[in-house]
């Protein structure tokens, strides 16, 4: 069997048709990784650091090639694709220093002489299941910390990003068995979850729940990032023009295909009317690339049609664009009734609803009403209001006077509720996730 990816801007353009690994091939990849892991860990901090440093250099040298491939395979705008390639380089360099970081602590004994140590050790083989929307950065931010602390890894990318994953692994050029890509779909993903020693997953809520259940049954660590319905709050004292710029970028950037994209805009009091006009104007003029496929396009147009039937007003976009690709004009809707899927679900496209709120309390209640919240933004000139909102919002990541998108790679990444499960990704949190703590007690022999 093969797995194929197509250019979202020109669906007739077949990017790759790769042989799938199958269950047996995935199992074999895990076995090779398990055989390579003791040597990779025992090679020491200097060897692992140097390998990740060389990988960063290789990705940097091929950055333009990788960006062009991301444009072609997943429809990412060139500027964003270049930024993603640069981010992958920065992540590799950041984690190249991690092997030298302290891996434990020394503690005092409760009584008498002795030495108490805590040490962190790798789990073994990390199973990495990644989505298509960040085909360079997400595989790197999962693999780099896992490898830095001495795990080996098997990567199962989304079918739509197969070519990016395979080329990325070639460039990293790690020793045999240290990082293996297994092309495929559900079969390969399920086998990897069933055989790896630790699993990191980013993808849909439905699949993520199955991954969580499978890993819980095996008693192995898992982290799952499942996206969410992200809200932006705009207060009456905000710079409306600046807020509209940020919101348009967070709704329409990369066609809204980011876990941190804004899906719900909540305008407080007098901010509603000027924001409605400013944001509709920007989204109408926004240049927006294609969505990932025909099914995604159908889901977006169906959501707009359903909302309008239910009484919503379409303020911008909401239609398929002309041309051969899977283009969708960024949509803004008002008067979407409570309970409509656009107010409860993530649609993973350039579509947002505009909601009024009488005051900050109501705005926060609306933002926190969803069962999954990854990111939120607050737009205000008042520091006290910003800090109060940040303290009360349920989102895992909160940005003040900034888009919900664009979080920093060296900070913990994750949401709340059903948006995430397990320990955070990125930064030092990832190093803890990919290791287990062990306590060592040394007492005098006599």
Which residues make up each language-model segment?
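Structural signal for hydrophobic packing residues in well-ordered secondary-structure cores
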Residues: 37, 41, 56-63, 67, ...
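Short, solvent-exposed loop/turn elements at beta->coil junctions and helix N-caps
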Residues: 54, 113-115, 317-323, 403
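Rossmann-like NAD(P) dinucleotide-binding subdomain of oxidoreductase/dehydrogenase enzymes
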Residues: 104-242, 273, 357
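N-terminal Rossmann-like NAD(P)+-binding subdomain of aldehyde/semialdehyde dehydrogenases
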Residues: 1-114, 285-288
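Conserved C-terminal structural/oligomerization subdomain of aldehyde/semialdehyde dehydrogenase
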Residues: 13-17, 233, 320, 327-446
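Residue-level signal for inorganic ion chemistry
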Residues: 11-12, 33, 48, 70, ...
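ALDH superfamily catalytic-core signature
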Residues: 206-337, 400
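Short, well-ordered beta-strand elements within core beta-sheets of diverse protein domains
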Residues: 15-21, 36-42, 128, 232-235, ...
